[in-house]
Regions:
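Detector for C-terminal structural segments
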Residues: 235, 342-376, 428, 437-446, ...
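N-terminal lobe/hinge region of extracytoplasmic solute-binding protein
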Residues: 37-90, 220
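Gly/Pro-rich hinge or "lid" segments in bacterial periplasmic/extracellular proteins
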Residues: 182-261, 266, 271, 607, ...
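Ligand-site clamp/hinge motif
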Residues: 244-304
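Aromatic- and charge-enriched surface segment that lines or borders ligand/interaction sites
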Residues: 83-136, 167, 331-333
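Structural transition elements
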Residues: 358-401, 416-425, 430-438
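Alpha-helical secondary-structure segments
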Residues: 114-120, 163-167, 224, 259-261, ...
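Surface-exposed binding/hinge segments that line
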Residues: 133-202, 229-231
């Protein structure tokens, strides 16, 4: 009897603790729906694809989880993998590494397995794929030969030993700590082969809307959130992945993820058609934030950034805005001409004109990338390669040496929406505009280069045309978001080497074994420098060689970095907990909490219904 009473007492004491484990208020409560302006609408949610927008990584970090990650200070820590270790196979004389995976599930309830990682990485290394992240995987045995089509994916030193054990065989003895850091890149997250294969098979019309990476109904995610709604110009909705580190039968809904939904409405967006004022998307979003209808603001233009400057938090992103030069162009084929154009840029003036705390680039590899160890800075160790102000005297001298006095060049830049959406916004409202950092940079570059005697034609390229413009080389100069998101300098430098570009490779017998970078650069000396470092284990020697490679890249100048991206945000007082970020600058919203969310969400639902009725009445009267 005493034992029974004692057990009841223990249960009674534990009940409040169990209840406290959940933030939900009642059986029907799923959690807060938090309206926010996370970032601009993403043009692809394929983590391994060429990213058109650097800030898309902020969304990737919410819906995908790679094997490892970093804490705020840059120390590698577990992600999907909870443990990793090295092993020397004496029998086969091979260097191996193993990752043990956590038990978690995709957003459709299927367990995340080592096979999903194998598929994602083999997909990046496929000759049919176009991914700038391939070089991060080249330490794996036969990876380069697989990418070139010389070997098949079956020859790759990558195996799922079982559902939760991933085995990697290296080409040579390699620093497993360095590789553990490399695979924290969000681009190396696992993907589901069955989902992607079925989507490709069913998309017989090659419809952009039916691509798996642009369709919420098709996508599955292994991160804390899943994509619940994805409609360009209208909304992005992320919903709790109820299977993320959670037993669906035993655990509370909010065991691993507190908020139910994060919703960004782009259409305001339900503008009063009688309003004649013009404004940018960011200004509309700021107005919503000020009115208490949005609780997190994560994207700004110059005006709105200045408005909230005293309250924003800013983190570096390991991405840059970069100009690619077409080295096959008659004017640009001489490296001295490309160097001159780089020297003439006033990077600080461009950053000031954009006005969002971006950082003028002083080298091709951005600040925050590791040098000899985690926590050391490659950019600081390497010093300045670029001037942040225009050096017109140097530019003029280089052009004189090259014997070039001018000419006409087309400078392309991204408009980060599809043409139909852009036209639809203009036709419907006539008042929404975009303040584009890419356009501001282009206008500044145009002025700088025309002062040297060139004629510069600005060419806006819409989102659906941008990748084909890059791949075809149909540009003279093009501005790109070089969204590498890696702490390894080799990831920024390798794609310019012929064998490391990550571009598609034809496997026909009469085709070239490798496809050069989009810039068309092909330089044997540069290729040799990369060959010498790709398998190098000693991090000090490796860093020295990588600095030499960056110097060589500046000499060849197929590309030049203009500024380093940052991400800034502010949030409403209803957000109860400080938002945490990791070393990459990605925010963690899995523990985001909002005061009075039931009352707030109820009010929002009522307002939404009233707005819908009003619009319906207006449409009927207009009809």
């Amino acid at each position: 009897m005493k034992k029974f009473v004692a057990l009841l007492l223990v249960l009674f004491v534990c009940l409040p603790v169990v209840a406290a484990c959940s933030t939900l208020q009642g059986d029907n409560d799923k959690g807060a729906t938090i309206s926010m302006y996370l970032t601009d609408f993403p043009q692809t949610l394929d983590p391994a694809a060429v990213q058109l927008q650097a800030d898309t990584a902020m969304i990737f970090s919410l819906i995908y989880q790679p094997l490892t990650t970093f804490d705020e200070k840059g120390k590698v820590k577990p992600g999907l993998a909870y443990e990793w270790y090295s092993y020397y196979d004496n029998r086969d004389e091979e260097y191996k590494m193993y990752f043990k995976l956590n038990e978690t599930m995709w957003s459709d309830g299927i367990s995340v397995s080592a096979d999903d990682v194998v598929y994602a990485w083999k997909r990046i290394l496929s000759p049919d794929s176009e991914s700038p992240y391939a070089s991060l995987l080249f330490p794996i045995k036969n990876a380069r030969q697989v990418k070139s089509g010389i070997m098949t994916s079956d020859d790759l030193g990558l195996v799922a030993e079982d559902d939760k054990l991933l085995s990697i065989t290296f080409e040579e003895d390699y620093d497993t700590g360095l590789f553990a850091e490399a695979v924290s890149c969000i681009a190396l997250s696992p993907l589901r082969e069955d989902i992607i294969t079925r989507a490709i098979k069913n998309n017989t019309d090659n419809s952009r809307e039916q691509d798996w990476d642009k369709n919420a109904a098709i996508m599955v995610c292994n991160g804390p959130f899943r994509v619940q709604g994805l409609e360009e110009g209208v909304k992005l909705s992320l919903e709790r992945n109820q299977y993320y580190y959670r037993d669906d039968e035993e655990d509370k809904l909010d065991r691993s993820v507190i908020p139910f939904r994060l919703v960004c409405y782009y259409e305001n967006e339900k503008i009063d058609k009688k309003d004649t004022a013009e404004a940018t998307e960011q200004q509309f979003q700021a107005d919503k934030f000020d009115a208490g209808k949005s609780f997190y603001l994560g994207s700004f233009d110059k005006t709105t950034f200045a408005k909230y400057a005293s309250s924003v938090t800013t983190n570096k992103l390991l991405s840059t805005y970069t100009y690619y030069f077409n080295t096959k162009n008659d004017i640009l084929k001489d490296a001295k001409v490309r160097q001159a154009l780089s020297a003439a840029l006033d990077r600080q003036a461009i950053v000031n004109a954009i006005g969002k705390n971006y950082i003028a680039s002083t080298g091709f590899v951005p600040s925050g990338v590791f040098d000899t160890a985690s926590g050391t800075d490659f950019r600081k160790a390497g010093g300045d390669i670029y001037s942040t102000t225009a050096d017109t005297a140097k530019a003029a001298s280089l052009l004189n040496e090259a014997g070039v006095k001018g000419g006409t060049l087309r400078l392309a830049y991204l408009v980060p929406v599809t043409k139909n959406v852009a036209n639809g916004l203009t036709d419907t409202f006539g008042k929404i505009s975009y303040e584009l950092a890419s356009q501001i940079a282009a206008e500044s570059a145009k002025a700088s280069w025309e002062s040297l005697g060139f004629t510069i034609e600005l060419v806006p390229v819409y989102a659906e045309e941008f990748q084909s413009t890059l791949s075809s080389g149909n540009f003279d100069i093009i501005g790109v978001d070089y969204a590498v998101n890696s702490t390894d300098a080799i990831a920024y430098l390798a794609p310019f080497a012929t064998k490391y570009s990550g571009n598609k490779v034809s496997i026909s017998l009469d085709a070239e074994t490798y496809t050069p970078h989009y810039t068309g650069l092909s330089d044997e000396e540069y290729d040799t420098l990369l060959d010498e470092v790709i398998y190098l284990k000693d991090r000090t020697e490796r860093a020295t060689k990588l600095h030499a490679i960056e110097t060589k890249l500046a000499e060849l100048c197929p590309a030049t970095a203009v500024f380093q991206y940052t991400t800034s945000y502010t949030y409403n007082e209803k957000i109860l907990k400080k938002i945490s970020s990791n070393y990459y600058g990605y925010n963690d919203f899995s523990d985001l909490r909002m005061a009075d969310y039931i009352e707030t969400n109820s009010r929002e639902n009522e307002e939404s219904l009233n707005e819908a009725k009003t619009r319906s009445t207006e449409d009927e009267s207009e009809g």
